[in-house]
């Protein structure tokens, strides 16, 4: 095969251990956020054709707004967004919100109302564009920038609207009887509960208020007693037959009962069944076949039945008995004497059909619709006298008014499914039929038919994403606005106003601002590393407004449910009080239009697995049999086994292969992104896997990122989708590269309206939300040819486009002098020396110069009483230089504040009067470095208010910025020129010119030589004979001029933004931000972890020569305690160690061959070795087709260690690990002989040594260590504050007091409780004594004692502290005899 392919070295090549082919493409990982918000804004939809959802639906639901008299109406026409004022980067730097102005077209219609007829005619129509505030936009990475910080709106899980049937699990009543209840939950509006009580009466509640009988609710809907009974029961007709009765034979009702007396055929009079015999279905069927129509009944059989209809005298209208009344010895003669010989009775046998509704009707005091409506009115508005109109209006508004009650499309779909209705999902209010269906189903449940709902099933919980949350919030804002508009429409002269005058957009804008600023679901983005960003955007929270609270959430809600499979990760959730309430979306899951989470499955057609993928929600999936992704298949795609393990209706079972309808698409579809990054997840205990996936999110980006030897194949996906690594937007050729930007000349997607140049600005040493460092590095070189989607730059924690959260470290599992006791970690000094775990952290300090009452503060170098030494890092403007090394206490920005005039003595006044004004007092309020922070200043930004004169520093920063913009413009212009002129030459060449620049002989055929005699700018003067070609040239010229002017315009806009002043908070004249970067090497006290929940704290860093070493002299980097493995059951780390060891061994082998090739050997052995490792398997590289140069590149990349991917649940098994160790020429045990670095002797037994991927977590000892001498005190108790942030002290708590008491250290204890804490006078005395060099002091009364006395007084106890004098003997004061 010809060696034609080349390998560019810009991606990491992995040996892939997965055996199951991936059928479905993994959806973009932040699709949840982007799709939802796009659907809400619908920016790209044409204005006329927007569907009624999102923002459009909000406007449609609030408008039109009519005034109270109906004389005018404000209609909504359409909305559009203008371009945002600042782009994302500018908003980040200036602390602004990235948003676009929303313009809404409104139409005001004024009517003429005829006073006599009341007919309306249109008098005037005005249309106008109205500004309705700014709407925040989402960045490409799925975040929002609010006041300069990146925020994420977390999706919320809540109970789906619809109807739910449940029971109390026998808790309410002592007998343990199940009380059933149904609840109709709308998206917004009143809840309706229908429930049984212990006496089997059915009640309804509205909004959890007082109960009313359900029959009252039905009466309010316009039904009467007879109609209610008719709806819920069937009836039988008893006909008088001589002395007895004739009753129809109903086999279904008699099934399973015993015949109490002989059953006699009413027509023939013969006994068909003898008394005491059981009525089996077979016997009943035989009777039916014989033609049995009716049975004989006696009066006794009739007693205890209930009338199905009113018994009425048709002539007089007198009602003898009502429907539902019981027939007994007293009532039967009444019916007979009135001359009725047919009695309809309800089919209630108290076994299959209970008399619940009839009993409720009997117990209900309300007789008619009016009573029922009044009753409901009294429940909803206690204390108000009801009238028929008000009661009817209120009842209609509760469930039947679309303004107040909205089931939403989801709610309607769920109701249809549960109640077997078929109502279009545009009907969003309740109907009478819905309420009847709910009551019917509830009664059936009580009769033992049907199942209750499981509220933790994902079919009954749905996700509200950004778009929907925002929609609800904006609707609230518009409703607030609506009230104001109505009032204004009524109060002003409507003929003269425009829509603009009616509208005050503040409430709408405030609602948006409030949502992004202070909602529980709007969170500060977790930006420690790319993985934590992605996980944050894919998080699902059950908390938040309208959700659960931590305290109320029980065990069931938090638990893993069978429907979570493939939708929500069972592993990744926080430890602690939020466990199970905050979840993560599974890798392949997506949210459908109704808000239910869907998971993909492969279809099975005629017993063969196809590549067709369908997405199903939990409700739809329940009816299928779903096989696992790792089921064994034959060549033709049918199942090998006769019985297949599958999931059906939440159970795992074995089913015949013909019954299987679907199959999972991938083994990793059940876990989240973070869990899918853990190799050998299948060998770890679930609790440790949870810690592992949570700790990967806390890994600090290191100075030199390194992709793991043992990965899972998810790494490139995370790096790409998180936006950390930059992918090319379209194919092209790299034109320029430096550390800060990449310029690419596009060769595909060339659109004349867009620029043909892509400029990618790289982020250099920017601060993330968590103070880690965001830095991007280019991977391409000039001239590289790129395809769309190629990675062109690495970001934080990425390495060649792979996620790289930590480093591969050589680990030995063995104890070492007790330094790895209790999960401690022992490190080699090499790790510090080679900056293996060094990270950069950036702190931001900001200082504002305000305008105070006494005059403006000033940022200056001229600070009173400060030595020149302290000012050495400041420039003439008083701001620190970039590159200055700063320490605690150093001045970053010099600032002085005017101080109030101190009162003057007469002498001073005299001197003032003679010598003129002395400069007013100022005090030094400079910003200094806080204690414990060292670093280098990496960036300074100066912001000035409009109209405030800029200082030197601000001007210099501005000049740099403009130069940078000019360079971008010039480069883009140069590429544009090059492209256009190259195309122009192609168009001109070979044509005969009829005109040209000065001195050109017309009629000459144009060639490259002829054209190049003239300067480029004159080439446009050539005119050629071919008119079509000449037309194309003209068009090119037009395009070129347009592009040029567009480029210039863009540049001018940007410059204008740089030069104009900044928006500042009120009273602020100037603001300076200083960014200080610090390199943090690893040190004892830092927390480290592997990917399997194996965490520990660095206990000691040992000199390299003292660390244990291998036979070839290599010292290990890390020593871990072997006891950390067995009890924790995270065996994955051991498999990773062995496999990592094999990878490194293989790398060494390849490295040796590469050196041999460079020394002149043949390349074939190297090619074969690489092919045997990476070329095999389903996703192998086409090594045989690579040219020699590519092979060398590959060998260089794999020299430190071959990278492999072992996907979760489908990865390498023990045999694969052994095979790989053998290939690398290592022992299959994975153990090695180790020598003690201090004595040089071998250790007693073989030790497991290998490579583990270790992470440094964002719990650094530098951020935690803290010391205080004097500092702030609490206002009330006068005790020192607590915590590092407040510069607080250490709490000397109850147990510590016991310890001192146990030692009998009375004086130490007294100091602790008084002068070292809250004895104010004593503190001062001690300080004075120390200053004097004296060591005597006296302890007084602690302030907290005074607080206690005050508390007791507030309870009405008169408590006073009496000082009894010390008597002559010198005995101590008596205890105060205080309580009177």
From Swiss-Prot:
The keyword Transcription applies. Signal peptide: none annotated. The keyword Cell cycle does not apply. GO terms for molecular function: DNA binding; DNA-directed RNA polymerase activity; ribonucleoside binding. Its EC number is 2.7.7.6. It catalyses: RNA(n) + a ribonucleoside 5'-triphosphate = RNA(n+1) + diphosphate. One of its GO terms (cellular component) is DNA-directed RNA polymerase complex. Keywords: DNA-directed RNA polymerase, Nucleotidyltransferase, Transcription, Transferase. GO terms for biological process: DNA-templated transcription. Transmembrane segments: none annotated. Belongs to the RNA polymerase beta chain family. DNA-dependent RNA polymerase catalyzes the transcription of DNA into RNA using the four ribonucleoside triphosphates as substrates. PANTHER family: DNA-DIRECTED RNA POLYMERASE I SUBUNIT 2. The RNAP catalytic core consists of 2 alpha, 1 beta, 1 beta' and 1 omega subunit. When a sigma factor is associated with the core the holoenzyme is formed, which can initiate transcription. This is DNA-directed RNA polymerase subunit beta. It comes from Sinorhizobium medicae (strain WSM419) (Ensifer medicae).
């Amino acid at each position: 095969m010809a060696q034609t392919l080349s390998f560019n070295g810009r991606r990491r090549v992995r040996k892939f251990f997965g055996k199951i082919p991936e059928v479905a493409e993994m959806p973009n990982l932040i699709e949840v956020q982007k799709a939802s918000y796009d659907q809400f804004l619908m920016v790209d939809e044409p204005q006329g054709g927007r569907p009624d959802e999102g923002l459009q639906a909000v406007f449609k639901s609030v408008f039109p707004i009519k005034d109270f008299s109906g004389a005018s109406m404000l209609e909504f026409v359409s909305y559009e967004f203008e371009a945002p004022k600042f782009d994302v980067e500018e908003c980040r730097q200036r602390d602004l919100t990235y948003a676009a102005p929303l313009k809404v077209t409104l139409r005001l219609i004024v009517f003429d109302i005829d006073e006599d007829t009341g007919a309306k005619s249109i008098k005037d129509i005005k249309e106008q564009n109205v500004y309705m505030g700014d709407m925040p936009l989402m960045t490409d990475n799925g975040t929002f920038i609010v006041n300069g910080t990146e925020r994420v709106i977390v999706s919320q899980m809540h109970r789906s609207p619809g109807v739910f049937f449940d029971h109390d699990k026998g808790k309410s009543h002592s007998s343990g009887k199940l009380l059933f209840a149904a609840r109709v939950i709308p998206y917004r509006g009143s809840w309706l509960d229908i429930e049984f009580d212990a006496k089997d009466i059915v009640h309804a509640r509205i909004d959890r208020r007082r109960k009313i009988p359900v029959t009252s609710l039905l009466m309010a809907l316009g039904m009467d007693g007879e109609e209610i009974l008719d709806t819920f029961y069937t009836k039988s007709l008893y006909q008088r037959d001589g002395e007895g009765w004739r009753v129809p034979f109903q086999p279904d009702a008699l099934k399973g009962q015993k015949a109490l007396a002989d059953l006699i055929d009413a027509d023939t009079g013969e006994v068909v069944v003898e008394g005491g015999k059981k009525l089996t279905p077979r016997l009943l069927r035989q009777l039916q076949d014989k033609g049995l129509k009716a049975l004989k009944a006696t009066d006794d059989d009739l007693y205890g039945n209930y009338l199905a209809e009113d018994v009425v005298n048709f002539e007089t209208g007198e009602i003898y008995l009502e429907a539902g009344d019981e027939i007994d010895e007293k009532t039967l003669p009444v019916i007979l004497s009135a001359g009725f010989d047919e009695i309809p009775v309800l089919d209630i046998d108290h076994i299959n059909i209970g008399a619940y509704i009839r009993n409720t009707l009997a117990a209900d005091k309300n007789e008619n619709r009016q009573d029922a409506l009044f009753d409901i009115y009294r429940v909803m508005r206690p204390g108000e006298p009801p009238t028929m109109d008000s009661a009817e209006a209120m009842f209609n508004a509760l469930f039947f008014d679309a303004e107040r009650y909205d089931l939403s499309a989801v709610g309607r779909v769920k109701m249809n499914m549960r109640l077997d209705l078929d109502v279009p999902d545009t009907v969003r209010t309740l109907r009478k039929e819905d309420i009847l269906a709910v009551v019917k189903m509830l009664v059936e449940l009580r009769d033992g038919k049907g199942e209750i709902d499981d509220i933790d099933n994902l079919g009954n919980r749905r996700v509200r994403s950004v778009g929907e949350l925002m929609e609800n919030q904006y609707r609230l804002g518009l409703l607030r606005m609506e009230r104001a508009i109505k009032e204004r429409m009524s109060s002003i002269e409507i003929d003269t106003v425009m829509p603009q005058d009616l509208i005050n957009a503040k409430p709408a804008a405030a609602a948006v601002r409030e949502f992004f600023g202070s909602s529980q679901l709007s969170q500060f983005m977790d930006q420690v590393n790319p993985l934590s960003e992605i996980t944050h955007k894919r998080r699902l929270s059950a908390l938040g407004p309208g959700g659960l609270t931590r305290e109320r959430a029980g065990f069931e809600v938090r638990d893993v449910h069978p429907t979570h499979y493939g939708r929500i990760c069972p592993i990744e959730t926080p430890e602690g009080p939020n466990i199970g309430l905050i979840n993560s979306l599974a890798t392949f899951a997506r949210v459908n239009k109704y808000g239910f989470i869907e998971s993909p499955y492969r279809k099975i057609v005629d017993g063969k697995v196809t590549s067709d993928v369908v997405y199903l929600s939990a409700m739809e999936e329940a009816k299928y049999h779903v096989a696992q992704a790792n089921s064994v298949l034959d060549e033709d795609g049918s199942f090998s086994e006769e019985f297949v393990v599958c999931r059906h209706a939440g159970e795992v079972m074995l089913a015949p292969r013909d019954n299987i309808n679907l199959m999972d698409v991938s083994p990793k579809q059940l876990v989240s992104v973070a869990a899918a990054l853990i190799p050998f997840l299948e060998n770890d205990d679930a609790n440790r896997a949870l810690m592992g996936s949570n700790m990967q999110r806390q890994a600090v980006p290191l100075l030199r990122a390194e992709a793991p030897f043992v990965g899972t194949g998810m790494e490139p996906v995370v790096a790409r989708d998180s936006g950390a690594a930059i992918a090319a937007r379209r194919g092209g050729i790299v034109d320029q590269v430096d550390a800060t930007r990449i310029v690419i000349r596009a060769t595909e997607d060339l659109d004349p309206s867009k620029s043909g140049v892509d400029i990618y600005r790289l982020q250099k040493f920017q601060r993330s939300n968590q103070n880690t460092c965001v830095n991007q590095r280019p991977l391409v070189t000039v001239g590289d040819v790129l395809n769309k989607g190629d990675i062109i730059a690495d970001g934080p924690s990425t390495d060649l486009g792979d996620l790289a959260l930590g480093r591969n470290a050589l680990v030995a599992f063995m104890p070492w002098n007790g330094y790895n006791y209790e999960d401690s970690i022992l490190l080699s000094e090499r790790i510090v020396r080679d900056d293996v775990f060094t990270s950069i952290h950036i702190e931001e300090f900001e200082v504002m110069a305000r305008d105070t009452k006494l005059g403006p503060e000033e940022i200056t170098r001229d600070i009173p009483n400060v030595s020149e030494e302290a000012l050495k890092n400041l420039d003439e403007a008083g701001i620190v230089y970039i590159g200055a090394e700063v320490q605690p206490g150093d001045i970053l920005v010099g600032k002085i504040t005017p101080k109030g005039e101190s009162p003057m003595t007469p002498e001073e006044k005299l001197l003032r009067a003679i010598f003129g004004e002395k400069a007013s007092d100022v005090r030094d309020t400079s910003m200094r470095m806080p204690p414990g922070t060292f670093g280098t200043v990496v960036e300074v930004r100066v912001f000035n208010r409009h109209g405030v004169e800029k200082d030197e520093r601000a001007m210099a920063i501005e000049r740099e910025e403009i130069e940078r913009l000019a360079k971008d413009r010039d480069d883009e212009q140069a590429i544009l020129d090059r492209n256009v002129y190259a195309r122009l030459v192609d168009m001109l060449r070979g044509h005969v010119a009829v005109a040209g620049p000065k001195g050109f002989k017309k009629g000459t055929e144009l060639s490259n030589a002829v054209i190049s005699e003239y300067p480029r700018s004159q080439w446009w003067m050539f005119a050629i004979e071919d008119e079509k070609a000449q037309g194309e040239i003209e068009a090119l010229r037009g395009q070129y001029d347009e592009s040029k002017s567009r480029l210039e315009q863009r540049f001018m806009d940007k410059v204008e933004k740089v030069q104009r002043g900044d928006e500042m908070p009120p009273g602020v004249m100037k603001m300076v931000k200083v960014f200080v970067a610090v390199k943090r090497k690893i040190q004892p006290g830092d927390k480290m972890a592997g990917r399997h929940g194996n965490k520990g704290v660095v206990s000691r860093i040992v000199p390299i020569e003292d660390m244990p070493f291998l036979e070839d002299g290599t010292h290990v980097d890390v020593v871990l305690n072997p006891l950390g493995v067995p009890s924790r059951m995270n065996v994955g780390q051991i498999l990773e160690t062995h496999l990592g060891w094999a990878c490194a061994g293989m790398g060494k082998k390849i490295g040796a061959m590469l050196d041999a090739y460079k020394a002149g050997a043949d390349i074939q052995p190297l090619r074969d070795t690489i092919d045997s490792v990476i070329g095999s398997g389903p996703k192998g590289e086409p090594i045989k087709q690579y040219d020699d140069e590519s092979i060398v590149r590959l060998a260089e990349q794999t020299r430190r260690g071959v990278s492999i991917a072992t996907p979760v649940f489908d990865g390498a098994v023990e045999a694969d690990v052994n095979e790989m160790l053998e290939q690398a020429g290592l022992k299959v045990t994975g153990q090695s002989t180790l020598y003690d670095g201090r004595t040089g002797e071998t250790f007693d037994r073989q030790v497991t040594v290998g490579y583990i991927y270790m992470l440094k977590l964002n719990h650094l000892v530098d951020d935690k260590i803290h010391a205080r001498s004097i500092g702030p005190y609490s206002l009330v108790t006068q005790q020192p504050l607590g915590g590092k942030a407040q510069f607080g002290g250490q709490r000397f708590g109850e147990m510590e007091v016991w310890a001192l008491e146990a030692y009998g250290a009375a004086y130490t204890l007294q100091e602790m409780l008084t002068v070292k804490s809250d004895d104010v006078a004593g503190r001062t005395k001690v300080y004075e004594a120390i200053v004097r060099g004296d060591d005597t002091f006296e302890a007084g009364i602690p302030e907290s004692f005074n607080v206690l006395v005050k508390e007791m007084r507030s309870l009405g106890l008169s408590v006073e502290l009496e000082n009894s004098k010390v008597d002559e003997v010198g005995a101590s004061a008596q205890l105060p005899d205080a309580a009177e």
